[in-house]
Each structure stands twice: as C-alpha cells, then as structure tokens.
From Swiss-Prot:
Family the entry assigns: Belongs to the IlvD/Edd family.
Required cofactor names: [2Fe-2S] cluster; Mg(2+)
Cofactor: binding details: Binds 1 [2Fe-2S] cluster per subunit. This cluster acts as a Lewis acid cofactor.
Source domain of life: Bacteria
PROSITE patterns registered for this protein in UniProt: ILVD_EDD_1 (PS00886), ILVD_EDD_2 (PS00887)
Gene: ilvD
GO molecular function: 2 iron, 2 sulfur cluster binding; dihydroxy-acid dehydratase activity; magnesium ion binding
Protein name: Dihydroxy-acid dehydratase
Amino acid sequence: MPKYRSATTTHGRNMAGARALWRATGMTDADFGKPIIAVVNSFTQFVPGHVHLRDLGKLVAEQIEAAGGVAKEFNTIAVDDGIAMGHGGMLYSLPSRELIADSVEYMVNAHCADAMVCISNCDKITPGMLMASLRLNIPVIFVSGGPMEAGKTKLSDQIIKLDLVDAMIQGADPKVSDSQSDQVERSACPTCGSCSGMFTANSMNCLTEALGLSQPGNGSLLATHADRKQLFLNAGKRIVELTKRYYEQDDESALPRNIASKAAFENAMTLDIAMGGSTNTVLHLLAAAQEAEIDFTMSDIDKLSRKVPQLCKVAPSTQKYHMEDVHRAGGVIGILGELDRAGLLNRDVKNVLGLTLPQTLEQYDIIVTQDDAVKNMFRAGPAGIRTTQAFSQDCRWDTLDDDRSNGCIRSLEHAYSKDGGLAVLYGNFAENGCIVKTAGVDDSILKFTGPAKVYESQDDAVEAILGGKVVAGDVVVIRYEGPKGGPGMQEMLYPTSFLKSMGLGKACALITDGRFSGGTSGLSIGHVSPEAASGGSIGLIEDGDLIAIDIPNRGIQLQVSDAELAARREAQEARGNKAWTPKNRERQVSFALRAYASLATSADKGAVRDKSKLGG
C-alpha cells in the first residue's frame, strides 16, 4: 500500500526542520497525519478568464480541510492569448504551457504534495496543468473558471450575439464606422470567464469532462452563475475521498492515468470532432497523451475524424450559439449522450466521481435523466450584466434546449455534417499531417486550388492582407512560425480575421506551420508537419506554386514535381547554417524562447520537448 508522499516531510525526527516550517504555515500536530493537497490556482488580473479566481482557491481549500485534508494553495502563470495576439507577445503563449506544467511539477514534488485540485480556465493553463497531472500521476480534479457570457448588442435594429473575434474583424474592416466598431468592442466581452465561443479554452475545459478528470457541467456552466460554486465545493470534498482511496485503500483507479486512459482520450477526441472544437486541442491532447505514456497519435485522430459527425456548431463557426447555449442543451454530457447512442464512444471508462460513462449519462444527460436538480442546473443562463465576479447571478432559461433535430446539439440523424468538425490532411508538404477545423469552412471551398503567396512571418502576411496584396483565389502560406521556427508557434487569428475584414473569408485559404486561435474559422490549415525550421517541405514552397486542398479526401498537395522539390531542397541545404531559416526576417528572440526552441518538436508530436535530446 502506498504511503502518503507528504509523510516524507512530516514524519521522523530528521524532518524536524521541515515540520518547523510547516508549523509556520499554520499546520499543527493533528495535521501531520493528514494528506496535503495542493490547490493549484491560476488567478491573475491580466486575463478575464482568471480575474475571478482569487477567492476560489480558498473556497476549495475550506472544503478540503473540512473533509480531513490539509490544503496548500499556489499559483501558476497565465497568458491571455487574445491580449498577446498580433505582436511579439504571442511567441510566449505556447511555451508557457511547458512552464506551467513544469512549475506544477516543481511545486508538488518539492513539497511532496499528495494530490491536487487544478483551478484552470484559459488556453494554455488547462493543458499545462493537464500535462503536469498526468506526469505526476497523483489524484487530481479539474475545476475551471467557466465560460464568459456572450456579448450582445443592437445593430440594424436587431440584437446580435458577439465575442472577441467580432471585435477584431470589425475593428479591421474599413467599411465599418468608428462608432459601430467601438460599440462592438465594448459589447464583445461582457463578463469574467473564458471567451464565450467554442474557442481553445472552452474546448479544453469540455475535454477534461470527456477525459473523466472534471465534473459534469465543468465545460459549459457560466463563470458568473451561482450554480458553478457547487463544482468548486464538490471538488474540495471529492479530492480528499480520491486521495484516501489511493493511499489508504491502494485503489489505483483513483489515479489520473487510470481515469484518462487511452479509451478516454479517444472519447475526448471524438467529442472534440463532434463539437467542432479548437484545432489547438489536437496539439494539447497529443502532448497530454505523451505525459500519460499513452500511444495516441495523429493517426488515431485521423481515423476518428473519418467516422465522427458534427453534432454541435458553436461560435466562431456560427454566431447563433455560444457556450451558454451549449449548456442549455445539456453541455458536454448532452453531446456525449448523442455520441453514445450513435455507438461512437468507449463505454468502459470512469470519471472522478467514480461513475462509468453509462452511469454518468443516466444521471446527467438531459434527454434521459429523471433528476430535476440536474435539469435545473442545465437551465442556468446568462444575466447580461457586466461583471468580474464569479457566482454573481442566478438567472435561468425558462426551458431546456432538448431539440435534437434543430437545436444547438443534434442527434446522429440530424447532424450538422456527416463529417466531423476537425480533419487531418496529408500531402507532399505535410507528410506528417496538418489540421483544419472543417466546422468553420464553408461548403463552397472544401476543395480549393490556388497560387501560393508565401510569407516568412505573420507580420508580413498581415501587412500584405491589409495592403490589398492578397486577392481572391490566393493561398496564403505563412511559414517559419512553428514551435521551433517562431519560436513558439504563434496563433494566426489576426491574418484569418483580416481576410474576413477584407471580404476574402470564403475566397482564400491560409496554410501555416503555426497554429490558429480557437476563434479562427475559414479555410485555415495549420500545424503543418514537419515545420519549415525542421526541414519540412513547406519551406520549399515558392510564390505562384499551385496548391490543391481536398478536405473531403483528406489531401493537400503542392503541384510541383518531385524533381523540382529535390532541387529546391538541395539549394536550401546549400545555405549552410542559414538553411531552414527565414530570409529577411528581423525578430528579437529572447534567451528563454531560444531555450524552448532548442528542444521543441513539430506539431504532430504535440510541440512537446524532444526528450531524446536530454537522454530521455
């Protein structure tokens, strides 16, 4: 039977110094036999998705201590991708994922904590904490800060829903007046919480439900709603139960690697495809699987993408629905219920509540549950009041959205598309694959061929788009923006948003070895692997080369002969130490980013660090 990790620092005469320090934090003799549980918070005033988390760690800690544990809180960093977008700050976003994972490992192992409650929310924070949890493999529960309410404003005598992306598009559209742009900006992000669409943050918080590491409702229940408080209270109580199950009963089913099994990873990816989640989730699930030592690859994702339909369509793929609407329709469990009825899920999985998938669906799927309290929870809705306070309102929808024919969540028979919301494409410059969010691609451009316009930085591409140098029919190629080449694999939300601003959203394609924001839609193909900086053939594309994209057949092809590509590769290699680096790009790269780049792998590996370079 395993002993508490914390006993290393709390037991034995030789640990008198450690106990003296523990006493200085408020611990007493009675605490030294209890499990020490880390409350891993991520409060910051920089990020609306985290601005309301300051007091929530204390809320969880109180429940831990009431249940017989000792709670110790610490904080991680948190980068706001939206604020970091469009300038050098975006170089730091993806690398922050590794820093978060490492910082959690450092704190938990340095102090021998027995278990964790992870209070996450936004883009790299949930993935970083997830990676750490699976690396450490001690009992854990995730509880996120929750989604923002959708923005709403009146334009042309009609109330419309808004989010961050609308503010970006209208701000760059020369046809939009200053007053309208200002109105949209002021209305787009009305409350605390992660941005209101199915962007990266909300996608990842939904996936923790499918992985079994968070409670039902975690991905969709609004940050502002009073009902969300119960998730935090439950997490504090439940983590003590899980911890004692493992350490006192030798029950390894309480460990995250046994909950988030390969079957659970497949379910999570199935959910992601069905709900049209962010392409970034592919990157993060691949990275998390490696930490869990699970053989889950792009090949697995490709197989799933060919059989899973799209059952949910949410902003940015449509402005009709946001996360508040997904919640009203039953949230993640509602989508999983439809996938289960379609025979597309692994049923032999459990969650942190100890429930199997069938048990979870029986209790929490609004289509089948008899539990009025559950139905009431899914009626939790927005208040439409600007606030940065968690749990500040208790508004409810009059009815649930249980219409599986025409509602937010659809049944298999009434799917938005028989093809899912994400697809993996392969071709002669994406030998290891690339990713497209098909949920955001107009049917008219699922097949697209056009001449390449090549840029070696996001900045140059933005200048060209706004300067009118990109025209209908072009394929914009942005390279040397991968994990190593950027470094940091910048998100390309500004280029895709500006294409829409210029009226080219359905008339152009964009291909990159970088990545896209969860707010991106359009024919936007990212994660091209291998990346240019690693010798990938995307580095051989020249202006005017024809590129053919065939999403239905999962293909992407540079229409240049093998002989010509071989000649170009030879010329590239002849550049010596300048080979596979961008030409005429001036970019200040800090030592910290260079250190990240030296170990970074391409996107098909999750952009994790190359362990082989460290003898791992």
